[in-house]
Amino acid sequence: MSFETFNFTAAINKAITESGYKDPTEIQQKSIPEILLNKHILASAQTGTGKTAAFVLPILELLLQDKNKVRGPRVLIVSPTRELANQITDSVKKYARHTNINSATVVGGMSYKLQNKLLSKPLDILIATPGRLLDLFKQGKIKFKDTKIMVLDEADKMLDMGFVPDIRKIFNATTKQQQMLMFSATLDKSVSKIASEFLTNPLTISIKPDTKGHSN
């Protein structure tokens, strides 16, 4: 299988080529077509298997297909730590660089003034840590009525760090009609339980830990 199988737009294919990717990794082969079909996904994949691209690439494609003009954010990506959120931000910028899709990141440690400025403009993709996202929502700086896709990345880590109550509050503030994507290094009972709360009839994808791929 090659990336051409997914029929991405030329702008995304150009970014994939420039990133040096030849063939999609296993998590990408299994996730991308299903995400493009707007399915809810519960996926288990280790870091280094290309899981970030597995959700970012099809999300960008779906955004390009949606011509509706809204304030956004149209996509919400929640990550447990500032470091992981910044890594996702780098990937989004890399894959979207030949498009007009814009993104912003709100995490702990950044000034509220800067983040408020980022949120004052129409936004396609918002990448955030749970605590800061919830703070900004409570302040009325973010609304989720336009959110069509929500990603919970590193779900097992968010569980370990005690973020589930925050995630629940954020989820309850959405329309609950959005496509839900949940990625985790493990799929134990606690992760599956949380998934059952947020996802509707999800397709479960599990990639063995020894599967290797490109880093993003």
Regions found by a protein language model. Give the residues of each.
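Proline-centered helix-kink/hinge sites
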Residues: P24-I27, P33-E34, P58, P73, ...
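Nucleotide phosphate-binding site architecture
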Residues: K22, L42, L60, A85, ...
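Walker A/P-loop NTP-binding motif
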Residues: Q29-I41, T52-K69, N86, S91-Y95, ...
